[in-house]
């Protein structure tokens, strides 16, 4: 009886491994066929190298005008395309720079922990590339911008926050379990 149970368990474990392997192969195949995303905004496109990642950004307007950095919100479809309807109007009077945050839009998406600290560091470093830019930030990114400014990573000449939210809240329980479950399959 015990031998039969062991065989059954091993058989189901084999099926599970086979299914997991098929899922990984399908995911890689779909990723390879997806191709690159088109830049969401009109303008000049470039990338900013940050911590080994290529961070896509778009520039519009006269570079001699006041720089306005537009930081999009964090959501399932987040990208600098959030500013699509207003970038031309903003570029009439400003040098607009709109990055796609790490893991969003046309920017790299390496398998790492995307946290508030990561985005605060990125925003601080990116804004420091410009001489006291004006900053427009929406949603949760407004919190990242204000944290970077508060830490003194950079200065801003003006700040506009659209629907700002806070990063606060309780830490999730059992973070070690969450990290284990989110680890890539090898």
What spans do the regions from the language model cover?
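N-terminal signal-anchor transmembrane helix
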Residues: 30-66
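Flexible "cap/lid" loop of the alpha/beta hydrolase fold
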Residues: 146-185
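Gly/Ala-rich beta-loop-alpha elbow adjacent to hydrolase catalytic centers
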Residues: 136-137, 141-145
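Hydrophobic alpha-helical topogenic segments used for membrane insertion/localization
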Residues: 3-31
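Active-site loop/oxyanion-hole signature of alpha/beta-hydrolase fold enzymes
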Residues: 88, 98-136
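Conserved HGGG/HGGXW glycine-rich cap/lid loop of the alpha/beta-hydrolase fold
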Residues: 53, 58-106
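Conserved catalytic-core motifs of eukaryotic protein kinase domains, centered on the activation segment
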Residues: 80-82, 107-112, 170-172
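Structural signature of beta-strand start/N-cap positions in the alpha/beta core
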Residues: 67, 95, 132-134, 155-158
